[in-house]
Amino acid sequence: MKSYIYVHTVSADKVESHGLVWQARKELHKAVRKVLAASARVLRSPFADTFSTVDIEDHDCAVWLLLRKSREDSKAARLEAVRELSEAHHWHDYQYRIIAQACDPRTLIGLARSKESDRRFFLPPPPLPSLKEDSSTEEELRHLLASLPQTEIDECLQYFTSLALSESSQSLAAQKGGLWCFGGNGLPYAESFGEVPSATVEMFCLEAVVKHSEIPSHCDHIEAGGGLQLLQRLYQLYKDCPKVQRNIMRIIGNMALNEHLHPAIVRSGWVSIMAEALKSYHIMEASHAARTLANLDRETVCEKYQDGVYVLHPQCRTSQPIKADVLFIHGLMGAAFKTWRQHDSKRALTENVVVDENRYTTCWPKTWLAKDCPALRIISVEYDTSLSDWRARCPMERKSIAFRSNELLSKLRAAGVGDRPVIWISHSMGGLLVKKMLLEASRKPELSALINNTRGMIFYSVPHHGSRLAEYSVNIRYLLFPSLEVKELSKDSPALKKLQDDFVEFAKDKNFQVLNFVETQPTFIGRMIKLHIVPVESADLGIGDLIPVDVNHLDICKPKTKDAFLYQRTLQFICETLARDLKN
């Protein structure tokens, strides 16, 4: 047990200076008596008669008692200690600092994931090492990237890494493919396809490190190369660039999947950074932090949230029992958050907007659904649509619905999806992925729980029978979908027809509940072309209600208000389908 004494300096007039030494000695002796008394009570050890306990305060003793309780062998006692610590809001600063300096990583992470924890529990990150002479963050990032293994990685990552290491800012900006749209904004990106991205080498290198961090062995190399400190330097440097900060948090979240790296992550101060980010009003920032902290919290979380899997609710430790899961799967060139924003075209594409939850939300599943159904775990997933823009540089199988569905299925199982009742909610091509995932799971005995626990699904403008998009020119098709996806979406696609036939038979056999929404308005493609991407006949699964809505393809999953029909009908379906499970 360590004890800490904090001495605060005060100014003194020269006239009073003669008694300063005596006064300081008196205060130090008083502090020592209090610390020894508190320690004696906590440790239940004999207390020397030469020290007095007259000055000890009850709340000082409580600090040490809670600290000891947080290290008990009993998990229930440890959890109770963290809960009590998180509810302490009227201590003196030094008492929070005692906990901050003396608690173990398990307690610190628990406090970071506790909604009401005082920020004074979290010490600032340790000072960063100085940059090498004549070096820069760009050069350090290049050096880190170059130190990562370049063998046994796929063609896409090889190509991306080599570009980041060899090209200049100007030549990188001239690469006008999809290289700059990891988790991009979909059709709005297509509208600006002719514009040159304003990006830097640092950002480009960072994108490559994100992809490397998905490989567990590469995370070890990132840590060994000082990556945790370098990423923290970049995080501080780009405080006003949310995209850079989110990519950095993606890397830390991926590294946190490896439990042997947890001590290094904690020592480098990332828990304090994530604790602050978790309280952010920016939903994306808070969700990235929540994923990282959940991966660090092995005390209460057994699931692991891999890259692209985000828990929207609950993001903190909670006593509320979770009885079912609701999953949100975006469409091709969509995103885990912006696809599910409230309809508001003027606000929607603002990168750094902070909004009043009662007036506007950048992610309605987190803001509205979590409040209406607190017993749900709400997950939104993101798959890497930008890979499909790397033209012939990437293996073709990475672009197929089959490949994407298997990859997502593996990630969702790691997150514990299938262990409790599930409803799947999808937009556009995301619905095809849901169908393919469930069919694949039905063929694997080890995934039988996922099938048995699937209660139903909601499809927002899913092209079950193909899309008219495939009828248009090659240039337009390329802007929206890569060639393989276009072929799979065409009305005469054998793969799409087989997927539809197999799923309908399977869904009827399992008696899944289904709700279909479909757009009735065309969508602007670029600046001059309007296209009805998923017509009514294509969105008809053949099972469940089919509801036409007077919106376009992008807005079919974006309710205008919480009282709007789109949201209320969605909420009604969820509550009715899970009624029995939520009552248990």
Regions found by a protein language model. Give the residues of each.
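Post-His helix in hydrolase/transferase enzymes
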Residues: K558-C575
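Long amphipathic alpha-helical tracts in eukaryotic proteins
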Residues: M1-L332, N406, R413, G418, ...
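Serine-dependent carboxylesterase/thioesterase catalytic core
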Residues: H330, D344-S345, S388, R398, ...
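Conserved beta-strand elements of beta-rich interaction domains across eukaryotes
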Residues: G331-G334, Y383-S388, M429-G431, L439, ...
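Short, proline-enriched alpha-helix->beta-strand connector loops that line the catalytic pocket
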Residues: N453-R455, D509-V514, L541-G544
